[in-house]
Amino acid sequence: MIFFRVHFINFFLILWFSSSYVFPYGDSLRIKIESIVNGASGKVGVSILGFEPYDTLTINGSGKFPMQSVFKFPLALAILNQVDKGRFSLEQKIHLNKDNLLPETWSPLREKYPDGGVDITLDELLTATVSQSDNNGCDILFRLIGGTKKVEQYIHSLGIKDIAIVATEAEMHIDWQIQYHNWSSPTAMNQLLYKFFYGKILSQKSRDYLNQVMVKTTTSPDRLKGLLPKGTIVAHKTGSSGENENGLAAATNDIGIVTLPDGKRFIISVFVSDSMADEKTRNKISAEIVKAVWDNYNMSHFNNYK
């Protein structure tokens, strides 16, 4: 029965994601999004999955985009899979010391525990890694689970192949080019988001836990959430490369699940890569795309009740 369910979900996703876009007002929405993408001064990948079968729209959906910290979402899935199996517990203690609280990287945990020498729960570690995108927390989790390969193997075991996870945060800081080895296609990331929320790859308890952790994300609020009404529920994970010495930004990403006023949801992944635009412009790409989808759905809902 489990074998049948997994393969039914995979078959359903193949049909869903290989379909042409059939959004309400699909032509106008695609035109709108393409006009937004044109201002990126770089490569943009977009995948949108609505709440009705065949409600899809993709732009560069099969392209390879560096994930940066978006890869902390599949890492969290892999950790929680092990929690569900009883190997880990959210209450178990993880020791922090100065050796695993590296300097010169984004780490709210290091700011909170500058001298190390403390034990924190896996819950606190995972929350900091996802909600606050803590880089040290990320690499501690990779060591806990057995390395990047273990996470990649788990994601591939779900039937999602177009995601590569080969380098830790510390390794990405060694050389600018290394970040490109951690990549995903927008379509694959949407497939993973779908399986997370609807595909029962985690227990209900673990799914709800991670969903709430992602809702509490504090990084880059001006991307997916930037133009949505205050209080809109968005479970998301950002990824950012910063800019190199030439002003090139390898990754300005945000992926997540947006809840509409009527309680329905749509899934969206936006990757902005190799852009020469400034940070405000790059962030606005995601904000304007998700707002266009939001307005499209709300207009459709309004017209259905005229």
Regions found by a protein language model. Give the residues of each.
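Bacterial Sec-dependent N-terminal signal peptides
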Residues: 1-27
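Beta-lactamase-like hydrolase cores
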Residues: 22-63, 242
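Acidic helix-start/capping segments at beta-turn-to-alpha-helix junctions
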Residues: 51, 90-109, 145-146, 213
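Structured C-terminal helix/loop/strand segments within mature extracytoplasmic catalytic/sensor domains
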Residues: 25-36, 143-144, 148, 191-223, ...
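Active-site SXXK
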Residues: 54, 66-96, 268
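Mid-domain, small-residue-enriched loop/turn segments at the edges of structured enzyme/sensor domains
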Residues: 118, 139-201
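Conserved catalytic neighborhood of penicillin-recognizing serine enzymes
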Residues: 101-139
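Short, well-structured active-site flanking segments
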Residues: 81-101, 148, 152, 203-207
